Amino acid sequence: VIEAQQLSKRFGALAAVRAVSFTAADGRITGLLGPNGAGKSTTLRMLYTVLKPDCGDALIDGHSALRAPLAAARCLGVLPHGAGIYPNLSARENILYFGALQGLTRAAARSRAAELVRLLEMEEFAERRAKGFSQGERLKTALARALVHSPRNLVLDEPTNGLDVMAVRALRRLLGALRDVCCSRAT
């Protein structure tokens, strides 16, 4: 469960986020909607502890983003807007690197990477350098990195940006399947 509690953030005179509160329940897909500049990305950055709120807090599976930011962040898989992947690493190496950053052993990271490559249908490009990847291949690689540590919560910032209609549909199906797999494991 993700709980935003009166999150607020200012940048100088600009109030980017004003007292935002919501709950994103387990097993649900929750979206933040609003026009450009409404503070959606800023709100997400406060959730995944990249930005500290001026007021309020966020609880990620009970961990305070303010008082226990590392514990809160480890409960999240994050796909930030414009998620860059390392172009000189293969897709699999990108996943393994993030596994190491999340504290996975080499064996656990290898096993999880193999599982994600299958789940996300990345077999054709898993061993290729990411430099020439299509937008869809980059997205799958970034999504695999976000999922490598098997987080209970996934935060996506504009995941369909730059994708064609077919890729958007495929991503929606994939996210629904991921939710179904994760929710069936939890029960």
For each predicted feature, which ranges?
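Conserved ABC ATPase "signature" region
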Residues: 96, 100, 107-125
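Hydrophobic anchor residue at the start of the ABC signature
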Residues: 143
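Catalytic Walker B motif of ABC-type/P-loop ATPase nucleotide-binding domains
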Residues: 154-158
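Conserved catalytic motifs of ABC-family nucleotide-binding domains
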Residues: 150
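Helical segment within the ABC ATPase nucleotide-binding domain
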Residues: 168-181
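Conserved ABC transporter NBD signature motif
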Residues: 56-67, 71-72
